[in-house]
Amino acid sequence: MSVSGLPFDDFRTLLRELPGPDARALAAARERDAQLTKPPGALGRLEEIAFWLAAWTGRAPAVNRPLVAIFAGNHGVTRHGITPFPPAVTQQMVENFAAGGAAINQICVAHDLGLKVFDLALDYPTGDITEEAALSERDCAATMAFGMEAIAGGTDLLCIGEMGIGNTTIAAAINYALYGGSARDWVGPGTGSEGDMLERKIAAVEKAVALHSDHLDDPLEIMRRLGGREIAAMAGAILAARIERIPVLIDGYVATAAAAILKAANPAALDHCLIGHVSAEPGHLRSIEMLGKTPLLALGMRLGEGTGAALAAGIVKAAAACHSGMATFAQAGVSGKH
């Protein structure tokens, strides 16, 4: 990416010039669906998913190279005792991913999904958002650019996930800054915060948003001031996927916060995205509703790691398989609707 003016300038340009869906591929998918051996609409959302795949890939619905991308980052705000786990767990879980021992590894095996994990300077936590910006504009833009590389190896379905102790606090701050209400509306237990710890978490979100209140009219400023490296990288990955016409499945509360930044910058920025699941984190459903989306799954999960998006990838693969593999009425010798 070229450097022109301020670090965010290139991203602002990209967000203004997003490609739209492929109307011809969408029409072809609808035409084929009408000929398949089933009543119209009988596959419900599977049909809509197939149409979504066609519209954004520009071809018949297919998922041949699905990929889960996990972005890991650490946060200075954890020093306020807002989470029961130490920041060292982020690095330990990255190592667990590499060893194949995490839940996401098992889901990827079960659904034949690729997996990439991006370690985002874990030894250098972001700034404490209650006292300063999480990132400089230059660092935030560089991390977005790094996130865009998630698709470099090729994929036709990108599942976005994260790992980062303290990042549900970050997600809550972003949602509070974007949508208002109260900090308590957006803060949940995360990895298990309760009692006094939960109150400290709420207080941290309140203090952070108040500190940066003069800069909340710009979504990219919200991201750099209240976000984190995994937030910036996920936003970059989602943006890169749009440019390359790759459909995206977004995971939980934290990944949705990254997506919300893009939506605030351009209302059409998430048209190529579906929400994989609604997590048990209380603010997630509210955040999804603010995006105008409907999650594919509701399993009471709150793990992160891209697990909900990865499970939803199995549904997307099934939708594509039904669309491409089912016989038409003519092929099967089945009578159509009179």
UniProtKB/Swiss-Prot annotation:
InterPro entries: Nict_dMeBzImd_PRibTrfase, Nict_dMeBzImd_PRibTrfase_bact, Nict_dMeBzImd_PRibTrfase_N, Nict_dMeBzImd_PRibTrfase_sf. One of its GO terms (biological process) is cobalamin biosynthetic process. Signal peptide: none annotated. Transmembrane segments: none annotated. Keywords: Cobalamin biosynthesis, Glycosyltransferase, Transferase. The active site is at residue 305. One of its GO terms (molecular function) is nicotinate-nucleotide-dimethylbenzimidazole phosphoribosyltransferase activity. Its EC number is 2.4.2.21. It is an enzyme of class 2 (transferase). It catalyses: 5,6-dimethylbenzimidazole + nicotinate beta-D-ribonucleotide = alpha-ribazole 5'-phosphate + nicotinate + H(+). Pathway: Nucleoside biosynthesis; alpha-ribazole biosynthesis; alpha-ribazole from 5,6-dimethylbenzimidazole: step 1/2. It comes from the Bacteria. Pfam families: DBI_PRT (PF02277). The keyword Glycosyltransferase applies. The keyword Cytoplasm does not apply. HAMAP family: CobT. Belongs to the CobT family. PANTHER family: NICOTINATE-NUCLEOTIDE--DIMETHYLBENZIMIDAZOLE PHOSPHORIBOSYLTRANSFERASE (PTHR43463:SF1). Catalyzes the synthesis of alpha-ribazole-5'-phosphate from nicotinate mononucleotide (NAMN) and 5,6-dimethylbenzimidazole (DMB). This is Nicotinate-nucleotide--dimethylbenzimidazole phosphoribosyltransferase. The lineage of its organism: Bacteria, Pseudomonadati, Pseudomonadota, Alphaproteobacteria, Hyphomicrobiales.
